[in-house]
Design a protein with these regions (language model features):
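Active-site beta-strand/loop microenvironment that shapes enzyme catalytic pockets
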Residues: 121-157
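Hydrophobic beta-strand segments of well-ordered beta-sheets in folded domains
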Residues: 46-51, 106-110, 136-138
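Cap/lid and interdomain-hinge subdomains that line or gate substrate/regulatory clefts
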Residues: 79-125
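A generic secondary-structure signal
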Residues: 36-40, 101, 127-128
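Acidic, glycine-rich active-site loops and adjacent beta-strand->loop/helix elements
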Residues: 13, 56, 115-117, 145
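Generic structural hydrophobic/aromatic packing signal, biased to beta-strands
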Residues: 7-9, 69, 98, 110, ...
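A short aromatic-anchored loop/beta-hairpin motif
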Residues: 1-87
Length: 157
């Protein structure tokens, strides 16, 4: 019941070219790196695949759940075939978009993690996901730090 494959990708809405508009070209390298990570993840022989990312609360969404980029100006629906209201938070919607960009992949579900979840809660959640099947893969979506260099916002802190 181990996690046998994982990829970590960023989830800024600007990774979606239609949302980045004029800056789309500036993010080509980021999209290519995410594509490479997803491709490696999809080659793993697994029994379950989850997309994990920050959310307002810790909640599991079914694989059929959809998301939409309309709050960011693009009425693009992503994720599962559920025709109900799109409810995936941004992080999971970007994960769904990346998987669709890679040609689609069967997933077991989406797992939102409360931003204020502590280490013990995250470890327990990880154990629960790992126990979901004999071989588990995780696509983990996260925010990057703005403090990446001296010229970055807050870089001198």
């Amino acid at each position: 019941m181990p996690v046998v494959a994982a990829a970590v990708c960023p989830h800024p809405p600007a990774i979606v070219p239609q949302l980045a508009q004029g800056a789309a070209g500036e993010l080509d390298a980021l999209r290519a790196a995410a594509d490479d990570a997803i491709a490696a993840l999809l080659t793993a022989q697994v029994d379950a695949r989850f997309v994990v990312g920050p959310a307002a609360s810790t909640v599991r969404f079914a694989a059929s759940t959809g998301g939409c980029f309309a709050p960011w100006g693009l009425p693009l629906r992503v994720g599962g075939p559920d025709q109900g209201p799109p409810v995936l938070p941004l992080s999971l919607a970007v994960g769904a978009w990346l998987l669709e960009r890679a040609g689609g992949a069967e997933i077991t579900g989406y797992q939102g993690v409360a931003a204020d979840a502590g280490p013990a809660a995250c470890a327990a959640l990880g154990a629960t996901l790992a126990a979901a099947a004999d071989r588990v893969a995780l696509l983990v979506m996260g925010d990057g730090s703005a403090r990446c260099g001296a010229r970055s916002p807050g870089g001198d802190d």
